[in-house]
């Protein structure tokens, strides 16, 4: 990606962040004014975004850094807004986890604006391809009794020592196919 594309991507993300902050303010949700940066991280593999409290900052006026996955930038604006709102809610006092207050704020936005802000979401929810779906299934473990199938992408204890395990559904013997 060249510098011009990176700049456009960053500008888009910052524009959407500001739009989300306005939505939160209009709903009287006490979003922090101490957001010091929005970073697009192409290395994130296991999440869509994060909100980090900057260390060493006073407790009265904490500062936060918001990070969004580079993959999310391939989604539509609505999906990006959903992730940014999720992270912005974390900047509210008492909302660093997905506790009661966080859920109340998310529910309020979901009901009024039709967002789908959740504690966790999958790639399908945002119309993105799951990067893990490209990996081939290397092991198929099948119950001889009921036919239940388990798949594994990596060599693991159940693959190495299949005879030590039983089917969780019926207790039958397992075999690799």
Locate each region found by the language model.
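Active-site-proximal or metal-binding-adjacent scaffold patches in catalytic folds
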Residues: 1-82, 91-177
């Amino acid at each position: 990606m060249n510098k011009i594309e990176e700049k456009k991507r960053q500008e888009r993300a910052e524009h959407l962040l500001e739009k989300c902050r306005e939505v939160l303010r209009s709903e009287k949700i006490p979003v922090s004014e101490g957001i010091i940066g929005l970073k697009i991280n192409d290395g994130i593999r296991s999440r869509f975004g994060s909100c980090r409290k900057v260390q060493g900052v006073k407790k009265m006026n904490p500062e936060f850094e918001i990070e969004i996955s580079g993959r999310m930038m391939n989604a539509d604006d609505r999906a990006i807004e959903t992730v940014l709102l999720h992270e912005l809610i974390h900047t509210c006092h008492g909302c660093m986890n997905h506790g009661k207050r966080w859920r109340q704020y998310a529910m309020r936005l979901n009901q009024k604006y039709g967002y789908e802000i959740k504690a966790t979401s999958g790639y399908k929810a945002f119309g993105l391809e799951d990067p893990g779906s490209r990996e081939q299934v290397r092991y198929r473990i099948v119950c001889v009794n009921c036919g239940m199938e388990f798949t594994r992408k990596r060599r693991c204890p159940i693959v190495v020592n299949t005879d030590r395990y039983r089917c969780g559904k019926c207790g039958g013997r397992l075999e690799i196919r």
